[in-house]
């Protein structure tokens, strides 16, 4: 519910911005025309320096935004304010009550048209999630180290400028951590295989000593010949294959590691900003129960979830965490007009996109745990790809700001009835969409 006690079911839309930038440096020869960088359309140019830890994003791109060029042509110097007026009226008409995180930091929220000209409810990204110089696996840090605690304090300090802004509903600590893309990952197994002496290895040894009377009992249980617990500092590859007891111990310590991964920055964030809700990690999916470790340090358990029917999945996650669950990304694209790629989930037509939206959101709303979702994304992507190397036909509007009425009308229908569905006073929309195979890479 909101601060005044009214029910608030998130009907969100991600990256509500005037345009959608496309990469130039890799595709320059494919453009028949590009504007001068210091000319009339200078505001359409930008540069992006990617996070080197995100393999899915290009490291550097020089971008141009033809949607923004169209707005400048239409409205001249007042283009930004005109776009904001138009978009705010549309969001209200569609029943959208949250504009997502929009790739914030603070400057994106406050300096975007929707931040300048209105106070539209939104979320916030805290910053770059804390890392340690030596990681356990991919971007998973040495979570019991002093370094991790110090980096978490720096991370949480990023909330200081926004802690009193009332139209920010809450914050995400990160988005789709790279380590979480391995469906059968046992993070403690990666710890034992690591060649360096990490602080978390010392904690693991203490954990094992607490479970076994002596080194002989441990060696027998794990089918591992070592002379002392200190020998566990020596890399042990594929430890899950040793014996059943090893799998049980590793699973238990993985939970402890993931819990610490969430706990340390979450507590630091709450110290700095007690006013906003912590929505967590935007995991790409939950493949095993240990991924929910640390949920008690969050206010809402959030996931990105690309499927057609979330009901069973939401109920499963809700049963693990026993707290509100939100979806921060989902979409369904089509190929009957516009861009040539469906996105992560495809349906046959634009009309079926509306069917898919209603089916997804209302099926979720019929569960006890679901508190809303944020559709990805507001605008169709550039035909020659964004800096995430995507050109998906998934927007609410096209490059000329023309709405895809088939989906926006459907969103409005769901917005009108979703509170009754959530309260059990109405049945959810139950027309399954006509699914087609995705053609995204």
Sequence positions of predicted segments:
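Active-site-adjacent substrate/metal-binding segments within catalytic domains
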Residues: 1-111, 129-164, 237, 243-244, ...
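Conserved, mostly hydrophobic/aromatic
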Residues: 5, 91, 99, 171, ...
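Polysaccharide-binding and catalytic clefts of secreted carbohydrate-active enzymes
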Residues: 27-79, 165-291
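Active-site clefts of carbohydrate-active enzymes
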Residues: 60-71, 129-141, 233-251, 284, ...
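Substrate-binding cleft/loops of secretory-pathway carbohydrate-active enzymes
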Residues: 106-114, 179-187, 277-313, 379-391
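Substrate-binding cleft of secreted/luminal carbohydrate-active enzymes
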Residues: 166-170, 174-176, 330, 345-398, ...
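Aromatic-rich peripheral "rim/lid" segments of glycoside hydrolase catalytic domains that contact
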Residues: 188-202, 376-441
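Glycoside hydrolase catalytic-domain groove-lining segments
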Residues: 252-343, 358-365
């Amino acid at each position: 519910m909101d601060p005044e006690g009214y029910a608030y079911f998130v009907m969100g839309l991600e990256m509500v911005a005037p345009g959608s930038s496309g990469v130039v440096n890799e595709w320059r020869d494919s453009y028949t025309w590009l504007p001068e960088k210091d000319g009339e359309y200078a505001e359409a140019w930008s540069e992006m320096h990617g996070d080197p830890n995100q393999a899915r994003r290009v490291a550097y791109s020089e971008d141009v935004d033809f949607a923004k060029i169209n707005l400048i042509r239409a409205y001249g110097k007042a283009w930004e304010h005109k776009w904001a007026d138009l978009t705010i009226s549309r969001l209200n008409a569609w029943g959208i009550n949250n504009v997502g995180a929009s790739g914030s930091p603070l400057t994106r929220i406050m300096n975007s048209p929707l931040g300048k000209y209105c106070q539209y409810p939104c979320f916030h990204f805290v910053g770059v999630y804390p890392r340690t110089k030596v990681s356990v696996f991919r971007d998973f840090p040495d979570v019991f180290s002093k370094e991790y605690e110090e980096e978490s304090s720096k991370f949480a300090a990023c909330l200081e400028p926004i802690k009193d802004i009332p139209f920010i509903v809450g914050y995400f600590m990160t988005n789709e951590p790279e380590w979480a893309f391995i469906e059968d990952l046992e993070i403690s197994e990666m710890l034992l295989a690591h060649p360096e002496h990490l602080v978390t290895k010392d904690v693991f040894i203490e954990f094992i000593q607490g479970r076994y009377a002596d080194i002989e009992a441990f060696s027998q249980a794990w089918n591992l010949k070592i002379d002392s617990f200190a020998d566990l500092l020596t890399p042990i590859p594929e430890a899950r294959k040793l014996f059943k007891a090893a799998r049980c111990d590793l699973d238990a310590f993985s939970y402890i590691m993931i819990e610490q991964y969430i706990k340390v920055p979450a507590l630091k964030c709450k110290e700095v900003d007690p006013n906003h809700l912590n929505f967590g990690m935007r995991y790409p999916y939950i493949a095993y129960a240990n991924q929910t470790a640390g949920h008690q340090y969050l206010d809402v358990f959030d996931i990105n979830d690309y499927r057609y029917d979330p009901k069973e999945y939401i109920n499963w996650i809700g049963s693990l965490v026993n707290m509100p669950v939100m979806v921060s990304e989902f979409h369904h694209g089509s190929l009957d007009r516009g861009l040539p790629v469906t996105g992560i989930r495809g349906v046959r037509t634009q009309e079926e996109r509306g069917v898919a939206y209603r089916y997804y959101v209302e099926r979720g709303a019929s569960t006890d745990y679901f508190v809303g979702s944020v559709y990805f994304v507001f605008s169709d992507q550039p035909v020659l790809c964004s800096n995430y190397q995507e050109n998906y036909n998934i927007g609410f509007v096209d490059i000329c700001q023309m709405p895809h009425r088939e989906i926006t009308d459907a969103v409005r229908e769901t917005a009108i009835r979703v509170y009754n569905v959530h309260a059990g006073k109405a049945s959810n929309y139950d027309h399954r969409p006509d699914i087609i195979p995705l053609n995204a890479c």
